[in-house]
Amino acid sequence: MSQQPEYTDWQQIVDLVKHSVEQKQHDMLLTMLMTPDEREALVSRVNIVRELLKGELSQRQISQMLGVGIATITRGSNELKLKSDEDKARLNQLLEGTKKGG
């Protein structure tokens, strides 16, 4: 009998996070799964996507504002280009609707 990991694909992780939200355990789960650097990188990625969707700043300006490399901005931009206008609108609405002060 070969050993296999319990979680093998992205959808299982999405389902795990969804379940943790339903159980009001998402903060604990995400804190335990991600290092401080990974959490910081995720915050940067959310800000990159948000700024790209707003379209008010150049990639260079976003890079300078967030203190990340231009290649990181480009990767975010390339991912957004793969999404439909409808998906981008939904993502923008989601990001806009959850803004909170630190």
UniProtKB/Swiss-Prot annotation:
<dbReference type="GO" id="GO:0003700">
    <property type="term" value="F:DNA-binding transcription factor activity"/>
</dbReference>
<keyword id="KW-0963">Cytoplasm</keyword>
<dbReference type="InterPro" id="IPR013335">
    <property type="entry name" value="Trp_repress_bac"/>
</dbReference>
<comment type="function">
    <text>This protein is an aporepressor. When complexed with L-tryptophan it binds the operator region of the trp operon and prevents the initiation of transcription.</text>
</comment>
<dbReference type="Pfam" id="PF01371">
    <property type="entry name" value="Trp_repressor"/>
</dbReference>
<keyword id="KW-0238">DNA-binding</keyword>
<dbReference type="InterPro" id="IPR038116">
    <property type="entry name" value="TrpR-like_sf"/>
</dbReference>
<comment type="similarity">
    <text>Belongs to the TrpR family.</text>
</comment>
<comment type="subunit">
    <text>Homodimer.</text>
</comment>
<feature type="DNA-binding region">
    <location>
        <begin position="59"/>
        <end position="82"/>
    </location>
</feature>
<keyword id="KW-0678">Repressor</keyword>
<keyword id="KW-0804">Transcription</keyword>
<dbReference type="InterPro" id="IPR000831">
    <property type="entry name" value="Trp_repress"/>
</dbReference>
<keyword id="KW-0805">Transcription regulation</keyword>
<dbReference type="InterPro" id="IPR010921">
    <property type="entry name" value="Trp_repressor/repl_initiator"/>
</dbReference>
<dbReference type="GO" id="GO:0045892">
    <property type="term" value="P:negative regulation of DNA-templated transcription"/>
</dbReference>
<protein>
    <recommendedName>
        <fullName>Trp operon repressor homolog</fullName>
    </recommendedName>
</protein>
<dbReference type="GO" id="GO:0005737">
    <property type="term" value="C:cytoplasm"/>
</dbReference>
<dbReference type="GO" id="GO:0043565">
    <property type="term" value="F:sequence-specific DNA binding"/>
</dbReference>
